[in-house]
UniProtKB/Swiss-Prot annotation:
Its EC number is 3.1.13.-. GO terms for molecular function: 3'-5'-RNA exonuclease activity; RNA binding. Component of the archaeal exosome complex. Forms a hexameric ring-like arrangement composed of 3 Rrp41-Rrp42 heterodimers. The hexameric ring associates with a trimer of Rrp4 and/or Csl4 subunits. GO terms for cellular component: cytoplasmic exosome (RNase complex). It comes from the Archaea. Keywords: Cytoplasm, Exonuclease, Exosome, Hydrolase, Nuclease. The keyword Hydrolase applies. It comes from Pyrococcus horikoshii (strain ATCC 700860 / DSM 12428 / JCM 9974 / NBRC 100139 / OT-3). PANTHER family: EXOSOME COMPLEX COMPONENT (PTHR11953), EXOSOME COMPLEX COMPONENT RRP41 (PTHR11953:SF0). Disulfide bonds: none annotated. This is Exosome complex component Rrp41.
Length: 249
């Protein structure tokens, strides 16, 4: 988080934010499932100005015997930001941040997967950020979870994610880029709504105990709204398949 330029107001006296949203309002979100033919499962998400695609391959045999687990599959996650995804061109390939976020996303997704059904195999998840606008980890988790469901991987529940944060002393939902850059805190959360389980909880910045509790509650509420959009995206795909089958008969 950076020092805020003089005169920049992230939230006005009417509670309107820099992009016109209210304090507890999500950015516009669009999701589509089954966007890549060559992957076992895939999903595309637009969340604000974020554009992210996720692909899943597997379960497939692990040829490196030393990596195999005799009792379960292993989940491998690669999160990557395309060089053109941000205003200042970044070097191709993984950097420290991408490696850290890959681990975070793996930890958020793993509790939802029934990996014991596929011993000695790997499930590989690739997340490519095509355009970045704050909140890429929660959008990446959301897209990856959809792609895993699309691949038919047995799951206890979908994983939905959202962040809350603090700007100019106010707890708000779903920070955009300016708010993330110049705000005081960011709290990404991932949940399995059916089980009421939290699979990811992080905090960047400074909050009081009361503010932290408020931010977590707000992020969970946001994630539940995201979960409904995930379900709608999956439903849309399978209704389309059913329609195609019906028409071909």
């Amino acid at each position: 988080m950076m020092e805020k330029p003089e005169g920049l107001k992230l939230i006005d006296e009417n509670g309107r934010r820099i992009d016109g949203r209210k304090k507890y309002e999500l950015r516009p979100i669009k999701m589509k499932v089954g966007v890549l033919k060559n992957a076992n499962g895939s999903a595309y998400i637009e969340w604000g100005r974020n554009k992210i695609i996720a692909a899943v391959y597997g379960p497939r045999e692990l040829h490196s015997k030393h990596l195999q687990r005799p009792d379960r599959a292993i989940l491998r996650v690669r999160y990557n930001m395309a060089p053109f995804s941000v205003e200042e061109r970044k070097k191709p390939g993984p950097d420290r941040r991408s490696i850290e976020i890959s681990k975070v996303i793996k930890g958020a997704l793993e509790p939802a997967l029934i990996l014991e059904m596929f011993p000695r195999t790997s499930i590989d998840v690739f997340i490519e950020v095509l355009q970045a606008d704050a909140g890429t980890r929660v959008a990446g988790i959301t897209a990856a979870s959809l792609a895993l469901a699309d691949a038919g991987i047995p799951m206890r529940d979908l994983v939905a994610a959202c962040a809350a944060g603090k700007i100019e002393g106010e707890i708000v939902l779903d920070l955009n880029k300016e708010e993330d850059n110049y705000g005081e805190a960011d709290v990404p959360v991932a949940i399995m709504p059916l089980k009421n389980d939290i699979t990811l909880l992080q905090m960047d910045g400074y909050l009081t105990k009361e503010e932290f509790i408020e931010a977590v509650r707000l992020a969970i509420k946001g994630a539940k709204a995201v979960y409904q959009k995930q379900r709608e995206a999956l439903k849309e795909k399978y209704l389309k398949i059913a329609q195609e089958v019906e028409e071909s008969e």
